[in-house]
């Protein structure tokens, strides 16, 4: 699904975005917001609130809660925030074509959200692109987070954990040197067995033996089976919510 969303976002940017008015100071494009990654809970609204609380405004949101008219103004943004791997191609297009820098990461947790805010401000002031979720120190090597690459890497950065991207666009820009892109169940089972704590969608629990399993549902994996159990981790105490 990510490849399809990536192509859709990129073509929307190419077809509808036009340079016009001046850049809007501290305005942000949110790119990569899909119901499969951010479900129907409050995460996207929380990202918007977090941006406002940190001195930013929302220019557009690709593609939840924004009209095509709003998305067409994306070149006027000061920076783009890429919250899933399917948004990277369109963010690069906006940077190459209109000079809008981008930052990659989801503001999960308290510590990582502060870093992400600082990186957004740096991107605006210096005009540079930053992979925030790929810049992390693995302090809890016994813990591994599985999921969509940008979200899982962001959560891994908050927790100091390793990341295994089990769904996503194979992109070295997102994953850090300690992260892994994995598509095979047997390989995943082996990886999980090498760690004490595994954070993943509940449908992965049958192949997680001998480790503490922390359920973090993801609609792209388990559909609507666990919708009510999907937490909003934006700018919150992740360890408390996940009972780590």
Give names to the regions the model predicted.
Residues 1-244:
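An N-terminal assembly and electron-transfer interface module characteristic of large anaerobic redox
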């Amino acid at each position: 699904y990510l490849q399809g969303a990536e192509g859709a976002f990129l073509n929307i940017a190419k077809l509808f975005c036009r340079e016009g008015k001046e850049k809007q100071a501290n305005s942000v494009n949110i790119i990569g917001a899909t119901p499969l990654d951010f479900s129907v809970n409050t995460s996207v609204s929380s990202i918007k609130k977090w941006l406002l609380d940190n001195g930013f405004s929302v220019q557009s949101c690709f593609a939840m809660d924004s009209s095509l008219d709003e998305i067409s103004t994306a070149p006027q943004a000061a920076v783009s925030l890429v919250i899933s791997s399917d948004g990277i191609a369109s963010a690069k297009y906006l940077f190459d074509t209109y000079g809008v820098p981008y930052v990659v990461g989801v503001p999960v947790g308290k510590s990582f959200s502060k870093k992400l805010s600082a990186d957004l401000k740096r991107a605006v002031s210096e005009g540079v692109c930053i992979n925030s979720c790929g810049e992390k120190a693995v302090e809890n090597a016994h813990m591994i987070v599985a999921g969509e690459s940008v979200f899982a890497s962001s959560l891994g950065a908050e927790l100091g954990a390793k990341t295994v991207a089990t769904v996503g666009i194979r992109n070295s820009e997102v994953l850090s040197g300690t992260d892994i892109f994995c598509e095979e169940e047997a390989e995943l089972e082996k990886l999980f067995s090498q760690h004490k704590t595994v954070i993943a969608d509940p449908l992965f629990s049958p192949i997680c033996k001998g480790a503490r399993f922390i359920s973090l549902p993801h609609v792209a994996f388990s559909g609507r089976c666990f919708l009510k159990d999907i937490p909003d981790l934006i700018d919150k105490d992740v360890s408390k919510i996940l009972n780590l």
